[in-house]
Curated annotation (Swiss-Prot):
Any GO BP annotation: tetrahydrofolate biosynthetic process
Catalyzed reactions per annotation: GTP + H2O = 7,8-dihydroneopterin 3'-triphosphate + formate + H(+)
Family in the record: Belongs to the GTP cyclohydrolase I family.
Keyword GTP-binding: yes
Protein's gene: folE
InterPro entries: GTP-CH-I_C/QueF, GTP-CH-I_N, GTP_CycHdrlase_I, GTP_CycHdrlase_I_CS, GTP_CycHdrlase_I_dom
Residue positions binding Zn(2+): C109, H112, C180
Listed name of the protein: GTP cyclohydrolase 1
SUPFAM superfamilies xrefs: Tetrahydrobiopterin biosynthesis enzymes-like (SSF55620)
EC numbers: 3.5.4.16
Pfam families xrefs: GTP_cyclohydroI
Organism placement in taxonomy: Bacteria, Pseudomonadati, Pseudomonadota, Gammaproteobacteria, Pasteurellales
């Protein structure tokens, strides 16, 4: 079993404490066993849909799906995959806003298991620590790689960054298209969903929040 880092444990505990952790159970089977079991079930699902799995285009699809679920699009359910964090002491006394815009978001709607596609913007005011800019992208990707609802994802990101950076002064903005709306049901291809979460100065000071939103809404 892979070791879970202290940062990952702290983030998970913070999410649980706030009641915003993804509803998950700890698997009792090894990954290989889970892949095998998922493939068998997907084989039956595809047969029930009416697909002929003897066709060479379809025969490996159950195995592909099993690998995709465990190793790729739902890999963020395993905190052993949480990005390795190297926190840097804020020796330069950086006090201005650090902001990363247009982070690619590709997640999966937990209601219909179809794609959520969008962008994430994250900002924070450093206190004692800063992190490499790419770590912000990696944390977004980690929480995207699990069945999600956008509202909870936004709150999870806020809490994760607050926990790692040891500051409340964090803002998260998410703009996404949901394929459960675009590809089924109403089939609206134009609409998108916006969610945001604020802590510390972003929550308390309107001008700071406006400064953040002025750049993400361009």
């Amino acid at each position: 079993m892979s070791k879970i880092s202290l940062d990952a444990l702290n983030v998970r505990n913070a999410l649980i404490e706030k009641g915003i952790e993804t509803p998950m159970i700890d698997p009792t089977q090894a990954k290989d066993e889970r892949r095998e079991s998922i493939a068998k079930h997907m084989h039956e699902v595809m047969k029930l849909i009416g697909l002929d799995l003897r066709d060479d285009s379809l025969e490996e699809t159950p195995n592909r799906l099993a690998k995709m679920f465990i190793d790729e699009i739902f890999s963020g359910m395993d905190y052993a995959n949480f990005p390795k964090m190297t926190k840097i002491k804020n020796q330069m006394k950086v006090s201005e806003m650090v902001q990363v815009n247009d982070i690619t978001l590709t997640s999966t709607c937990e209601h219909h298991f179809v794609t959520i596609d969008g962008k994430v913007c994250v900002a924070y005011y450093p206190k004692d620590w800063v992190i490499g800019l790419s770590k912000i992208n990696r944390i977004v990707s980690f929480f995207a790689q699990r069945p999600q609802v956008q509202e909870r994802l936004t709150e999870q990101l806020l809490t994760a960054f607050q926990t790692i950076l040891e500051t409340d002064d964090v803002a998260v903005y998410v703009k996404a298209t949901h394929f459960c709306v675009k590809a089924r049901g109403i089939r609206d291809t134009n609409s998108y969903t916006v969610t945001s979460a604020y802590g510390g100065v972003f929550l308390e000071d309107r001008d700071t929040r406006k400064e953040f939103l002025a750049t993400v809404q361009k």
